[in-house]
Amino acid sequence: MAQRAFPNPYADYNKSLAEGYFDAAGRLTPEFSQRLTNKIRELLQQMERGLKSADPRDGTGYTGWAGIAVLYLHLYDVFGDPAYLQLAHGYVKQSLNCLTKRSITFLCGDAGPLAVAAVLYHKMNNEKQAEDCITRLIHLNKIDPHAPNEMLYGRIGYIYALLFVNKNFGVEKIPQSHIQQICETILTSGENLARKRNFTAKSPLMYEWYQEYYVGAAHGLAGIYYYLMQPSLQVSQGKLHSLVKPSVDYVCQLKFPSGNYPPCIGDNRDLLVHWCHGAPGVIYMLIQAYKVFREEKYLCDAYQCADVIWQYGLLKKGYGLCHGSAGNAYAFLTLYNLTQDMKYLYRACKFAEWCLEYGEHGCRTPDTPFSLFEGMAGTIYFLADLLVPTKARFPAFEL
């Protein structure tokens, strides 16, 4: 882990250190808010210049135009400036020209551009176009009967798109029955694989992606179980206790002595502290398990995740969401919003401070340096989210 991160140069939380960032109620100080806002404006200008040379055919949320639209929708929600809505509109149109009819997910497939477009048209009071996008989104379910189940390319990533629409419309635009039907498919698929590979006694559910049993949030078990425990998926109490909980407990047993988690079952190298692989993604599963099952052990493991991230989370890979410092900082915000413990808000602010020095640490330049999940757009999204910490949610993943 240590060789993939910069040593954390910051002192950990104490009350007097935190006073420069937020008050006793957790509201950011005007000075720190201004620093964040100034950096957001500066990075947006850099990003817009950089996007002129981005791949014109990539419409995805992860590395393409839909992701930039997600950022501008978020900035519109945070700052209320209609100019951001217009910018989002331009990127939505570009993303809709890039649909591939191959993948169904929010981040890497057609569901992202369609869901984002539906929400954007709704905000612009263009309900006819919004409805058209929703219809197309619902029909995507038929594209790939052999889709995997994970977040980036699988059924969970499709479910996120459906929930994203319902949340932003404030009404059930996507019928609950449609969401539950996909959820049932995910559960059945997990039971079948667990039986086939002799996992059932240890873990009643099992999922693979490219012949590997991934553990993390992006491709693996933690991301899938985080969703299966969401109230909006309406998994029955019986199945939550008989299928999901023992499967979550199996993931908990994979924890390294450090408090981190392996990228795959059977991989004993304790290296990756990313949202996609490791503690920064697993923490969401643990917190959701604590909310649903009210067992202290899940919270203890989540605290351990946060300590690993504080120590090893300032990544040499960069400042992005998927495998970067901004994505890792969201773990602190999630824990803060659960516990109201100011230590975690402070840690998020310190990781934001690191991001305020974007490009000055000698990090690796990502393949898509301005994108939502690998690059600058994701960092901007995080800095804007931190302005109102209680509303912060890891984009395209956290509910």
Swiss-Prot record:
N-acetylalanine modification sites are A2
Identify the enzyme class: transferase
Q: In which tissues is it expressed?
A: Detected in erythrocytes, brain, kidney, testis, ovary, heart, lung, placenta and spleen (at protein level). Ubiquitous. Strongly expressed in brain, spinal cord, pituitary gland, kidney, heart, skeletal muscle, pancreas, ovary and testis.
Q: What is its EC number?
A: 2.5.1.18
Which Pfam families does UniProt cross-reference here?
LANC_like
Alphabetized, the UniProt keywords read: Acetylation, Cell membrane, Cytoplasm, Membrane, Metal-binding, Transferase, Zinc
Mutating R364 to A/E leads to what result?
A: Loss of glutathione binding
Gene3D superfamilies linked to this entry: 1.50.10.10
Which GO CC terms are listed, alphabetically?
cytoplasm; plasma membrane
Q: Name one GO biological process term.
A: peptide modification
- According to its UniProt record, which protein family does this protein belong to? Belongs to the LanC-like protein family.
Question: What name is this protein filed under?
Answer: Glutathione S-transferase LANCL1
| Native source organism of the sequence | Homo sapiens (Human)
The lineage, from the top, is: Eukaryota, Metazoa, Chordata, Craniata, Vertebrata
Q: Report the gene name.
A: LANCL1
